[in-house]
Every structure is written in structure tokens, then in C-alpha cells.
């Protein structure tokens, strides 16, 4: 398995993490990050490893970000890209989906300010 110890958002998305967490009253900032990754994957976009943005933003330790759910998120990324859990680009895919999901949620909120965090948990 590829070693993943931390994931950072882009510098631009550092503030989004705080804003969205506050707007949705989610408690800790890792909750919006988990939702963002899943939301990005749900939208079906497939990134190239070279699409990665800067990493000057919010830093998450793997255990803080995923808790005991890391195997689930790892499986979702691997299935989405049809790759093994030894793929060297896994950290990039996690980061890109984190950034993409945050940006998508932010656009959604701008289009519909009445959204709740639970809107992203149910389809």
C-alpha cells in the first residue's frame, strides 16, 4: 500500500475549509474534507496526476482526516481510477478530489445559500 501520511488543500481552499465548516456547523474541519472527497468522486471526474494544484493550504494528518475510514476512502479512489493501493499517485488523487470537492460545494452554496451539510450526505 502506498504510504499516505498527510494531505494538504491548495492555498485558495484553506479558507474554504473554515467557511464551509462554519456554514454547515459541522464541528471539526475534517468532516467537510471527507464530504468534499466523496462529492468529487460522485461527480465522476477523473484527474491526471499532473493536474495537482499547490499544496499551501490546510494540512490534514491521514488519521485526523479519515479516522478509521481510511480503507473505505482508499477503496473508493482505487475503484474510481481502477488502480491498486500501491499506486504512487494515490496521494495526488486524494488531494485533487479534496480540492475539487471543496470548490464544487462552494459553488453550490453560492448558487443556493439555503443548503445544509446534510444535503451532501443524501442523494
Regions found by a protein language model. Give the residues of each.
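N-proximal short alpha-helices
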Residues: 2-6, 71
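Surface-exposed, Lys/Arg-rich phosphate-binding patches that contact polyanionic backbones
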Residues: 3, 10-31, 35, 60-62, ...
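Short runs of predominantly hydrophobic/aromatic residues within well-ordered alpha helices
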Residues: 13, 29-32, 37, 69-74, ...
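Membrane-topology and secretion signals of cell-surface/extracellular proteins
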Residues: 15-20, 31, 40, 46-47, ...
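Short, surface-exposed loop and linker segments with low hydrophobicity and enrichment for Pro/Ser/Thr
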Residues: 26-28, 64-66, 89-91
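Short, basic amphipathic alpha-helical segments that act as recognition/interaction helices
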Residues: 27-51, 106
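Short, positively charged interaction helices/loops
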Residues: 42-85
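Low-complexity intrinsically disordered segments
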Residues: 80-123
